């Protein structure tokens, strides 16, 4: 266990609104096709929600644009400073560049967008309200592990009906499958704290499905700061998380940004339990390295995303393409 823990160390707008019992979203389609029109008008929020939490994302239907997008919110104290949106050029859907502005947990009455450059096509901005929920860790449940290859206990897991009880976050109905020989650990690069982690998972689902255009959350599992493990694509399902080399992998994502700080003890404990289960179930030696066929690299059996990328892997994402 200790060895494993050390190892892990003109603006044109078209507005669409739909509301469900638990979630709602608004789409703004904006054109930045003139130098004098790089800042949109401000849009008053029309979606009804009992919770202030919202995620702000965007996509452009073109490959690897160099555009930088921003948004700002009008709150009770007035307009805030512009917030940059992180650009992504790797996704399951070719011909799409996506942006993520993160999650806000404050109430706001209006939103505005801007681009640093003109763009030939429209930009779709999404404001997604993941819905209200109890501000505590969701109840978890464990499916019967009978028939599994491993004798060690499977950790408790919050399945989809646990983190999305409304049923409005459907899984892929025709997934592809893979036999994993490597376990890939990620972080979401979002906030390290939240009042409602299940809502954060629903926001990731919305970003991956409705902004990225994927079939489901890209990871197989996620772990929050309270140590709750969430099933996303689930075991043996081909994910979208390892730079076009997803075959033979299981992707596990820690919710938060751990470039400068380590995950807390609860998250690490659950990660170790999940990795121990997966390694035992799939007969993977956790502290060794082996050949990974999809990347054509010999990498640690428990790796991070950085172990295989466009600069190191022969079969990584070609420059300028969109694949995870």
Name these PLM-found stretches.
Residues 22-63, 136:
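Solvent-exposed, flexible loop/coil segments flanking beta-strands in beta-rich domains
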